[in-house]
């Protein structure tokens, strides 16, 4: 917050209190970072990034080293960021969790776009299975997934513009655009449901 020259001391304090409340981290405000759980650490990292009022945020492996409940919390935070009009770029090896929050995916291999579509389309693509996922990968609930030891990374690039409409652009390996929320009477419908575009 010290970098926010547009805010005086009281303004910075108000932003701090607002972020602590928004991310449910008021109770850990005086704790050392090493004493936080993985999920608490992720929420603090995201709140810190939002203190600068960004238009775009990078989440580097947000699903790594956190328990399943925290994974759900992080997904909700990602949907919350999108609803606030903040673009999100995610790099993560957790294919299951990342595909679960996307609407459209682009797979690029050796600098060439080899597939695009929703999660089911990507998972059914034989070339994607051959070069990236393997033939055992499944996205069904309760299925134990095999995570392949590769240097590949997932990338989510999301550009928000004009009333929740998304524009997609392929980056290095896999670009995912998050689900678009439906606007109902000026408020967003629940982001955890697949909805038609606005």
UniProtKB/Swiss-Prot annotation:
EC main group: translocase
Record has Isomerase as a keyword: no
Gene3D superfamilies listed in its UniProt record: P-loop containing nucleotide triphosphate hydrolases
Quaternary organization: Component of the lipopolysaccharide transport and assembly complex. The LptBFG transporter is composed of two ATP-binding proteins (LptB) and two transmembrane proteins (LptF and LptG).
Reported function: Part of the ABC transporter complex LptBFG involved in the translocation of lipopolysaccharide (LPS) from the inner membrane to the outer membrane. Probably responsible for energy coupling to the transport system.
Membrane topology: Peripheral membrane protein
The EC number(s) this enzyme carries: 7.5.2.-
SUPFAM superfamilies linked to this entry: P-loop containing nucleoside triphosphate hydrolases
Cellular localization per UniProt: Cytoplasm; Cell inner membrane
Family as reported in the entry's similarity comment: Belongs to the ABC transporter superfamily. Outer membrane lipopolysaccharide export (TC 1.B.42) family.
InterPro entries: ABC_AA/LPS_Transport, ABC_transporter-like_ATP-bd, BCA_ABC_TP_C, P-loop_NTPase
Domain (ABC transporter) ranges: 12-64
Protein name: Lipopolysaccharide export system ATP-binding protein LptB
Pfam family, one: ABC_tran
MF annotations from Gene Ontology: ATP binding; ATP hydrolysis activity
Organism: Pseudomonas putida
Main location: cytoplasm
Keywords assigned: ATP-binding, Cell inner membrane, Cell membrane, Cytoplasm, Membrane, Nucleotide-binding, Translocase, Transport
GO cellular component: cytoplasm; plasma membrane
Highest taxon of the lineage: Bacteria
């Amino acid at each position: 917050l010290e970098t926010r020259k547009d805010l005086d001391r009281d303004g910075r304090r108000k932003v701090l209190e607002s972020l602590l409340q928004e991310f449910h981290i008021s109770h850990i405000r005086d704790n050392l970072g090493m004493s936080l759980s993985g999920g608490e650490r992720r929420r603090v990292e995201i709140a810190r990034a939002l203190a600068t009022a960004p238009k775009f945020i990078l989440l580097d492996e947000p699903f790594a080293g956190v328990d399943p409940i925290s994974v759900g919390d992080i997904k909700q935070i990602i949907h919350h960021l999108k609803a606030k009009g903040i673009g999100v770029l995610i790099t993560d090896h957790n294919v299951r969790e990342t595909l679960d929050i996307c609407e459209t995916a682009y797979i690029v291999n050796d600098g060439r776009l080899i597939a695009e579509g929703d999660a089911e389309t990507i998972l059914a693509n034989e070339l994607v299975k051959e070069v990236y996922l393997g033939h055992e990968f499944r996205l069904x609930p309760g299925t134990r997934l095999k995570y392949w030891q590769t240097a590949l990374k997932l990338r989510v690039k999301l550009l928000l513009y004009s009333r929740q409409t998304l524009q997609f652009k392929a980056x290095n390996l896999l670009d995912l655009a998050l689900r678009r929320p439906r606007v109902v009477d000026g408020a967003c419908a629940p982001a955890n449901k697949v909805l038609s575009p606005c």
